Amino acid sequence: MRKVLLIEDDALLCWLLEKILKNKYDVTVKNDGEEAWSWLINENIPDLIVSDLKMPSLSGIELLENLSANDTLKSIPIIIHSGYEDAGKRKQCLDLGAFAYLVKPFEPEYLVSEVERAIESRNENILAK
């Protein structure tokens, strides 16, 4: 089963996103970016990260910056989600290597399709190497 790291500081939304994903994926939940980063640098390598943009302690953008600077972790696709449609933030996230930028609210099916697309893309990149 593919492993997904879900990073979300809103408890209700976190519960909902985990419920959507756990039928198809092994989901690990972290409630802020700092907690997630500590988990990642201890050699926990998920197939995908789904992260909120705006979080206490370490934002989604800071997480993207950390990932892109780490040779072991930079190949992990990350989907950023935000409650704000901000073209500048979207561009910044995509420029930093985010696979997708989703604006809340989004349909559960859309999230699942983006997760599947991101994991397939990672698998193709691994096979190409």
Task: Indicate residue ranges for each PLM-predicted region.
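Conserved acidic carboxylate
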Residues: 8
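Two-component/phosphorelay signaling modules centered on CheY-like receiver
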Residues: 11-29, 35
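The feature encodes the CheY-like receiver
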Residues: 14, 56, 65, 86, ...
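Acidic, metal-coordinating helix/loop segments flanking the phosphotransfer/catalytic sites
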Residues: 29-48
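Acidic catalytic/metal-coordinating carboxylates
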Residues: 32-35, 59-65
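Alpha4 helix (beta4-alpha4-beta5 surface) of REC/receiver domains from two-component response regulators
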Residues: 62, 85-100, 113
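C-terminal output helix
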Residues: 106-115
